[in-house]
Amino acid sequence: MQVLIVASLAFLAAWLVYSRWSDSRRRRGGGGSLPPGPPRLPIIGNMHQLGPNPHKSLAHLAKTYGPLMSLKLGNQLAVVASSPEMAREVLIKQGVALCRPFTPNAVCIHGHGEVSVLMLPATSNIWKRIRRIAREKLFSNPALQGTQDIRRERLRKLTDYAAGCSREGRAMNVGEATFTTMSNLMFATLFSIELTEYGASDAGANRKFREHVNAITTNMGVPNVADFFPIFAPLDPQGLRRKLTHHLGSLLELVQNLIDQRLQARDSSDYRKKKDFLDTLLDLSQGNEYDLSIKEIKHFFVDIIIAGSDTSAATAEWGMVELLLHPDKLEKLKAEMKSVVGEKSIVEESDIARLPYLRATVNEVFRLHPAAPLLAPHVAEEEARVNEYIIPKDTKVFVNVWAITRDPSIWKNPDSFEPERFLESDINFEGQHFELIPFGSGRRSCPGIPLASRMLHCMVGTLCHNFDWELEKGAESKQLQRQDVFGLALQKKVPLKAIPVKV
């Protein structure tokens, strides 16, 4: 044991000497310099400056060190882009050199890092196949048109649940209700089943499923010592790998069981094919065009379930928080709904184009509460030059979307909820306007934007069109706090619970 400790200390000392020499050499020049950044402490670099909310800490540092700054996180060099111009540089202009995804140590489990579309490089054949399938078979306009009835039914059930709460005078946990809606949508689209029930968050499958998804998104977003100091990775000092082994493993097992049941059913002579994504992929896996394995399908589905359930639900909850904080905006939205949607109980996807204030409201929610405030970090595949600065190979690259959307030089009154700012603007969240890129941009942008957009507009619109909302007595200030919890998805710290009142 003593020999191991001495060897580790010797290695750490040698690494520190080399790191300081290498860092000094880069800053002196030699073909270019690093972007400016805050002073670094020995060994830990700037880790102490991240805090519990890295997106906010990095935004504060960017005010001093500029829209492209460098930091040292343990022995990892990192660069943070905090302006639309720098975001365009790292995501588009240098997108090839800087597009390798960062794979956290904690998710190198169950083979997930080897086949997850979120972790694979854009040069990977698996990545290309799965992105093509997602784009053509799941998120294209024809594919979404074919699954519109599934989404309409989920919205109807959400409305029915809110109406039940209204009849009983019972508060509805908005985040849980929207999570149930989105997770049931994912499972209905993928497997033709519903996994969870409204109002049953403390029982059975509901509690376990949401616990798994929340644990995955939270723990994947936590800064991990094992990523900053790979020498400590086998020790898993924060226990993140252990936690994710359990939670990710449970979701993989759930999906594998559903796939196995379908494979067994398809062997039956009287099997009637289902019009879901699983049957589509199983058919494709038997052909030569896509060369899909069951393992790839399983991990792809887990990626879809996590991303589709949690981020959209969190964004819808934030939307309701802002509207309840600003009753004048809510009334303006309700008036538009009454004029366009009329007596219908559900906002249809075909209505969205005729609801400019609803579209502006969703844009403003994405601006104030981007689901992934730092996007998914990338790694430099090769050395790249951004303006006069050099980004060395293997540098971790972040885009601080949260800093961009709170920048007073871009947005007037950036901390205020003002949907009106988008009524006379062509800016949207689909990846072309770098002032607002909650889903990223370029080759690694989220392919699920069309689905997320449809559901967010319809969920927020339907809840506002059918109900007035009251907060529980004595809980008003707590319920409407804007405090968030950092992770892959930016969650509200105190869940919003409000009583729907049928209009």
Swiss-Prot record:
Major enzyme class: oxidoreductase
Membrane topology: Single-pass membrane protein
UniProt pathway annotation: Secondary metabolite biosynthesis; terpenoid biosynthesis
Membrane spanning residue stretches: 2-22
Key words of the record: Heme, Iron, Membrane, Metal-binding, Monooxygenase, Oxidoreductase, Transmembrane, Transmembrane helix
Organism superkingdom: Eukaryota
EC identifiers of the protein: 1.14.14.67
Pfam family, one: p450
Entry comment describing in which tissues the protein is expressed: Highly expressed in roots.
GO biological process: terpenoid biosynthetic process
Cofactors named for this entry: heme
PANTHER family: CYTOCHROME P450, FAMILY 76, SUBFAMILY C, POLYPEPTIDE 5-RELATED (PTHR47950), GERANIOL 8-HYDROXYLASE-LIKE (PTHR47950:SF4)
Family note: Belongs to the cytochrome P450 family.
Protein name as it appears in the record: 11-hydroxysugiol 20-monooxygenase
Native species: Salvia miltiorrhiza (Chinese sage)
